[in-house]
A protein has these predicted regions:
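Acyl-donor (CoA/ACP) binding surface of acyl/acetyltransferases
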Residues: 1-112
């Protein structure tokens, strides 16, 4: 409504083997309104429908309950936890999430 930037979704570490990392952040004023879920779903659709990306991966702090919930709502699978993976004031655990083209587009999409 107000045409202000509320947040962003980023793709990075895009690899030749058709994998990429995905991440996002949103201003505190716009949290818990569904904007991240909506934006992430659109970027996921774009990645799998318009590019050759086969797999998206994300790392989410285990203590960030809302962000872990967004991952699950968008169809990502928690594939494990990296213990004390990064220093964020203290050493922090991160859940690793993966999403395959076939998870969104169907099994036949894995070979395209």
């Amino acid at each position: 409504k107000n045409h202000r930037l509320a947040g962003e979704v980023n793709l990075f570490n895009i690899e030749n083997d058709r994998q990429a990392m995905i991440g996002y952040r949103i201003s505190a004023a716009y949290q818990n309104m569904g904007f991240v879920t909506e934006a992430l779903r659109r970027v996921i659709r774009f990645c799998f429908e318009e590019t050759g990306i086969q797999r998206l991966e994300a790392e989410v702090m285990t203590v960030n309950v809302a962000s872990n919930r967004v991952m699950e709502k968008c169809g990502f699978t928690c594939e494990g936890t990296k213990r004390q993976a990064k220093f964020v004031n203290i050493y922090t655990d991160f859940n690793i999430y993966g999403l395959l083209r076939s998870d969104i587009m169907g099994e036949h999409a894995a070979s395209t």
